[in-house]
Amino acid sequence: MITKNPMQLKAFIKNKAAEKHISAQLVMQNYMLERLLERISLSPYKNNFILKGGFLISAIVGLDTRATMDLDTTIKGFTLTHEAIRKIFTEICAIQIADDVQLEVVGISDIRETDDYPGIRVALKANYPPISVPLTVDVTTGDMITPREVEYTFSLLFDDRTISILAYNLETVLAEKLETVLSRNIANTRPRDYYDVHILYALRGADCDKATLRRALERTTQKRGSGTILTDYSEIMKEIRESDTLRKLWEKYSREYEYAKDISFDDTCKTIQTILDAIMV
């Protein structure tokens, strides 16, 4: 999108935020992540990056239904090293688009919060002076995608056009979320995992192939060494439903995000139980 000046961009952002009932900061963040994603789609690395995580979920269900502040991807076709990732992102940031935005790599570090997959965190800045927005991209490798990644058509926030990017298929998105919910059990401090399963199944459940989802879940648990959760899922879900801590975390989450306010913790648990009962028979 071409704007006359940064103030006009801020006005567009403010109007979109009001329309979606989310903060202007979230819209700005997602717009700048979109600017990065378009550059990836135009780069020689288009077929090496596979979109996943919150940004993909937001694209599937709508920004007003799921917001995120960063970008999660997995890569294929080259070794995941600091040097390789810096080189790739420097080249991607150098791609010029008529959107007034300049991107720069600020830093590279290892991801330490999770042992699910090895990863690197890329810190960037999106600049449209005086606007400067920090961006975070998590890049992993070795992800188990079942049966394979798909080409996803991504609708842009302001322009009436789309870009194409490789992404997780729906069943793999759900499988990873289900594995996270079950394996972390009552130690999970992220209510959005429950929300994501609930909203994805509510809006896209009809598009989900149960046999593929089961295979995806089995392969994900095998990859992560958590296979026993599939035989114990009913007991695990009982513990989760009875957890006061998880219930309080959900209540805080639903107060914070407008799109979750009419969904109860019991609703999310019921959805998860329904999915598991359907695929694990």
Regions found by a protein language model. Give the residues of each.
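Structured mid-to-C-terminal alpha-helical surface segments
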Residues: 1-49, 59-67, 71-281
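Catalytic metal-binding/acid-base residues of hydrolase active sites
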Residues: 56
